[in-house]
Amino acid sequence: MKSFVWTLLGALSLGSLTTAYGANASNSSVPTPDNTLVVSYTNTSCYTSGPLSPDTRFNRTTRGTFSKVRDALKFRLNGPIHHWDIANELFDTALGVEIIDTQYGINNRTSRDWCTAVSALEKGDLIEFAAAFTAFDDVNPTKEVVPDALVGTLALWAKYSYEYDLTSIVSLFGKNWTVDELGWGTYIAHSLNEISSNTTGAANATLFIDTQTKSDCYKLASTIESWKYAPLSAFPNYGPFYIYGQCVATFTSGYSPLVEPAFTFASALNTTLNSFPNGTLPTQTQVVGDIGVKFLQYFA
């Protein structure tokens, strides 16, 4: 399998366990990390230099148990829930370690924190991670907390370890996500977004293509075409567009049935965006719309 540079969404400002739990931080279900790993950063991904050496791995001797993680997830059902909080707590409680980020400050999780942390996981950990999140999903199925942070993380880990592909990773969650359900395109490209000028979402999309098939690309093409009927608020972020561009670059040359839906979507979206007076388009839809209109430049 080809080797690619992967990174998680940069500069994630996530609260510590204490912040996430507020006054309830002393809850017995939430162990306090008691060892620290200081990570020094460069402008390149930690994946560019191969496996981490033993002295840079997490100290696993004080690792928390995943039963505590599951308890923590259930406890959080009683308060505000955010998927980054959950993922943050999962790493803290499972690994029993608090990361000091030398680039952004103490307790700020960034892409390289995740890059380092995920490389310390083992096969059994993946199964337990899946069990913890599945338990959370069962308790509160209306909360869409699981996929984007964790699936991106596991996808990165899988690529790095050369032991799993994305399909088997997702199967750990008991979910049959397919590209036409928007899951792959949005979650993976969003979670594996660029953090430096030489790492692009287009390159990250190669992970998807590396483990999927041409038929999946056609499903994504059909999905993108269907978005022309959707309100702006329903659009996912730019992930599917990067991946769709990679689909075209991988499986076609020039104009083809795989390319046509993209033009249909972009034309409809452009018409919709032009109906907004200047300065009135909401920020989030402006970003999505800008990419929706311009993403053709990537592969046309």
Swiss-Prot record:
Signal peptide: 1-22
Main subcellular localisation: endoplasmic reticulum
Claim: Endoplasmic reticulum is one of the keywords in the record: yes
UniProt keyword Endoplasmic reticulum, yes or no: yes
A GO CC term attached to the entry: endoplasmic reticulum
Keywords assigned by UniProt, alphabetized: Endoplasmic reticulum, Signal
Localization annotation: Endoplasmic reticulum
Descriptive protein name: Uncharacterized protein PB24D3.07c
Organism (species): Schizosaccharomyces pombe (strain 972 / ATCC 24843)
